[in-house]
Structure formats: structure tokens, C-alpha cells
């Protein structure tokens, strides 16, 4: 390591680190290894040039990754320690992964033994599930974005293409690597999000077990054809359980694709499942409350005030004390158990119980988040919330085809014009006081997009118009959910229409 953060004008911004060699160079920055002076632990620092990012229109990508990683605390998601901003650069201080990309590991070793592939896959699914629980879909899962630490444990990285999911909102951006992208993504269709990551995980599992990709072709149109058709072969060396799981993940129809929950319950996945992966992690709010007493004392020994450290941790502040705390915490459990898993979780709870108890007896300062329940009353057991639903809408146990038939009947009765984007997705328009047949061909498709106004001006030449989208998708409890989202037009008018539409669908 360099004695100081020398070169390139980084010395003042990175005064707490000794910069080392360059790990990688990108189009708008580089990644360097560094040593945190206070703790002696290694980190990776992304150095992003602001001007180059602006020129390449990549600022949003960087902001998105920082926003997501600030939120996440998970053993199989790369840890963000701090972000340092200067007028010319952004320095993102992250967890250092000694053995680099999973991609290079697969290239070096070829296909993995099933037990090793399963261990890696279990960790990937754990990280992906955590993302989905926090309403984030990665959208670019591939071995190049999965890093290996010093114990060959997986860390999800590169959240630059990720989207934060909102209830009732479907993602439309086609992104990610074609070989790992789901059919609905490369087709440009709307998609809810979670099922896209499931497909990518299926491709990764295939690569782990086979050493090759299920969908590969130098000719991009041919590659897309294979992906859209789900055309691939399973090698004969795969076990029966693996041969059952992979095809269930690589289902072309996203509504029929296996879910993360079902993957976790699959017999192949359950074999030698580590204890810490058998239960969901606490949510991010609960994690912020947990303070490890031993690590806290280590930080206090470095010269920081106890109350200052606790206040910073519970409010998720970034400063020298919290950076030191998380570096010490991560390295303590990595060194003792090899996982930041059950031992990590149980130790945090145990130490926080002990810490909270002693503090309440000796001080009026309580080291847990304002508004949270008293730790003595709650026992400090982590609260595992019921999984949030991706959208609110009309749920039904009827078959998808039956649902769509009833939807089309209702739309026709209400004089709605529509255009199908896919088997379970359509764009719709509804005009007040105008017969929809005036604007439709015999297939209820739009004749001329330009003749419909979008501003809902009832005093204008044309009547008010509502544009909306309808999507049907599968929920985790084996139901189907019909979601409607307004695109343009008066909100109250749209609500009136929804009421009439739901009345028409009473048969469901």
C-alpha cells in the first residue's frame, strides 16, 4: 500500500486510506484497493470522474447504485462503507472481495461440483431475495456482477441497472446482458421485476453446473430467438433434482416461472442449506437498531465517544466512527465463521440485549431507534415482516386465459379501445361520450394514434381521454393479479372508470 492516498489529487479526500494497486479501469473511473488506516482492513474504492460520467450520461447509474447500497446490510450483498464527494470525483468505499468475479472462477475451474455450485447458488438466492423484500430488482445478474470474498462467499454487486419497484408500476427498460436476460426483457415488454431476476439466476445456475451458457450465439438475432423460444439442452451429467429445478426457472412465460420462495423450498436447494440461510434476515429498520457491543467497544477504544457512535449508527449516519464500526464488524465475523450469517445475527441480538440492559440501568440514554419498542418488552427478536406485495389490484384464482377473456369482454362493454403488447399486457384508451368503435378496426386496435387527445380537456374538440395499461401476473400464493395503471388523463375520471370496470368483472 502507498504510504498515503497519493496521486491524482486524491490525498485530501482519501486521507483516511492508504491507496494501493488498481483493481480495474472502466470508461469513467477506476477501482483501487486501499487500506483503512484506523482499522488496518482492506477496502475497494471506486473513483468516479464526474465530468466523464456527465459526458456518458452515467450519473443516474452511479446515484442508483449508491442509493441502493446505502440501504442494504446483507452477508451476500457488497457492503458500502462511505461515499466521499469532491467537485471532480466521487469516491465509493466498498467491501473488498479478494477473489474477484465469479465469472473468472467459472472460467478457471469449468463446471463445478454440485455441492459447490449449490453453496454458491444458495448465497445468490439469499441476496436476491433480500433485494426483492426491499422492493429492488437487480436486472443485471450475471457472474461478472457476483464477487467472491476471501472465503469464496458470494457478494451481489453492480446495482447500477437496478430499479426500485413501486406498487402497481411495471418496469419497461430493457437492460442487462443479453445472455442472462429474460425473454420479456429483450422483447421490450412490461414486467413486474422479480421474475426477471429468477430467469437470470436460472442461467447462472446452469453456468455453475455446466460450465457453459444455456443460451449462446455470436449472432444476436439468433441468440434472441433461442431465448424467446426457451431453446436449450440439459447435459446428461446433471442430477435429477437439478434437471427439475433449472427448467422451472427458465420458463419463457414469466407468469408460470418459479418464484424465489418456490426455489427456496425446492428439494435440490434445501440440501445442506446453512442455518443462517434457512430464515429471512431482519428488515433494514431492525438491522439499524442492532449494535454489537464488542465492536462498539473496539470503536470507543479508537478514541470515539460511545454516545456519538451509537447515535450515528442508529441514524445511519456516515462518519469516521461508523465506517470503522462496520469494517471491524464485518471482518470480525468473516474471520470467525466465514459467513456473516446466523452467528452474526445471533451475536448481534445477544450483544445488543446485553448492551441495552446495561445501558438502561446506568444511563438515561437508550441506544435504539426512536419510536421503536422497549428492548426489554420485545426481547429484541427480529421482526420478520410479511412480504410486501408487488402491486395492488384484482386477484383471482381463475386461469389466465379465463381472466383475460373476461377482461376483454368488460373492455368491450365499456367501449374501451386496446392494443395488445403481449399475451397478458395491453395498452388501453377510454373516451368519455364517444363510441370507441369510431376509432377501432375490427380487432379493437387503434386506427390512428393522433386523433386522441391526452390532456383530458372536456371543452376541447375531442372528449376527455384516459390512457391506461393492464397487466396480469402471477402472485406468490398461486393467484393471478390484474393490475391497472393510469398513464394520462384525469385521475378522478380514471377512478370512476375503474369502478365501472370492476363491476363488469364481478364474475371473477
From Swiss-Prot:
Residues 290-330 form the UBA domain. GO terms for biological process: signal transduction. Gene3D superfamilies: Kinase associated domain 1, KA1, Transferase(Phosphotransferase) domain 1. ATP binds at residues 23-31, 46. Residues 17-269 form the Protein kinase domain. Its EC number is 2.7.11.1. Belongs to the protein kinase superfamily. Ser/Thr protein kinase family. PANTHER family: MAP/MICROTUBULE AFFINITY-REGULATING KINASE, NON-SPECIFIC SERINE_THREONINE PROTEIN KINASE. This is Serine/threonine protein kinase OSK3.
